[in-house]
Design a protein with these regions (language model features):
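Beta-rich carbohydrate-recognition and catalytic domains
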Residues: 1-57, 73-142, 151-206, 222-263
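Short linear interaction motifs
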Residues: 60-63
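Beta-propeller and closely related beta-sheet repeat lectin domains
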Residues: 65-68, 145-148, 205, 210-225
Length: 263
């Protein structure tokens, strides 16, 4: 991921970081087991971007929060989810993208509503939106969830986990927390269900419990090198923040909790 922000300059007259956030997806490769990463020279490192050039004080704009990458055994492609912010012709939600060659950043194609035909382009090298806008999937069911994607061998389905919210029952207001959804094709998802109710950084109000974020399902017993699979009893990992005087600090904990799926 990349974000070009210069606060308080002519690139961001307001000096407000979020309003001047433009995000795209880029390729980084490691040849030493993840110790270090390198990128092809720009712009050949670009994987995906919205077909609009940067504009100050209209953000955040772009493609955000990519999931981990999983390989489907039935077609040999590698898949990932990405959150698209609403801007121009781009609708907000979760987009699905795939490639047959992880080494080629230009080989990724996104779902357009009926097939994987969206070919991302560098907005500084070309113009127009035709064939360059991804179609969000199952918005009512998963909203913009993308954080953690695994194939669950117990459920025999893909499992998506992410921070979200839903209206509560009875007199309860909105319920914030970590939710999950399942799918057999990465396009059609079940209505998200609550795993763990937590305060989110985006919903925090002074006096609330310390928030948590970045949920991921990981299974230490996964045979996948990149933990692409989970079983019946994986761990839910997440980051717990420690706020001070109602403001975020860099004091954060990595927490894990065992969860159990049932059919």
């Amino acid at each position: 991921m990349s974000a070009d922000v210069t606060e308080g300059s002519d690139r961001c007259p307001s000096g407000v970081y979020l309003k001047c956030w433009y995000n795209s997806l880029t390729l980084a490769r490691s040849v030493d087991g993840g110790r270090t990463f390198g990128q092809p020279p720009a712009p050949r490192h670009l994987i995906a971007a919205v077909p609009y050039r940067y504009q100050p004080d209209v953000g955040p704009v772009g493609l955000f929060q990519p999931s981990n990458v999983v390989r489907r055994s039935d077609d040999g492609h590698w898949y990932a989810l990405v959150h698209a912010q609403a801007f121009g012709a781009q609708r907000e939600g979760t987009c699905v993208m795939r490639t047959a060659d992880l080494r080629d950043p230009g080989s990724w194609r996104a779902w357009d509503g009926s097939a994987y035909r969206v070919r991302f382009a560098n907005p500084y090298e070309s113009s127009g939106t035709g064939g360059r806008i991804c179609a969000p999937v199952s918005f009512a069911e998963i909203a913009g969830m993308t954080h953690s994607l695994t194939y669950n061998t117990y459920l025999d389905e893909y499992v998506l986990v992410g921070p979200s919210s839903r209206p509560g029952h009875g007199r309860r207001g909105v319920v914030h927390g970590f939710y999950y959804s399942t799918s057999d094709d990465l396009i059609d998802w079940t209505p998200r269900k609550l795993i763990r109710e937590v305060t989110l950084p985006t919903s925090f109000e002074c006096g609330d419990p310390n928030p948590a974020y970045f949920p991921s399902l990981l299974d230490p017993d996964s045979p996948s090198r990149n933990f692409e699979t989970t079983g019946q009893r994986p761990y839910l990992y997440f980051t717990r923040y420690h706020f001070k005087d109602c403001h975020s600090t860099l004091n954060r904990d990595l927490v894990r909790v065992r969860v159990r799926f049932s059919r």
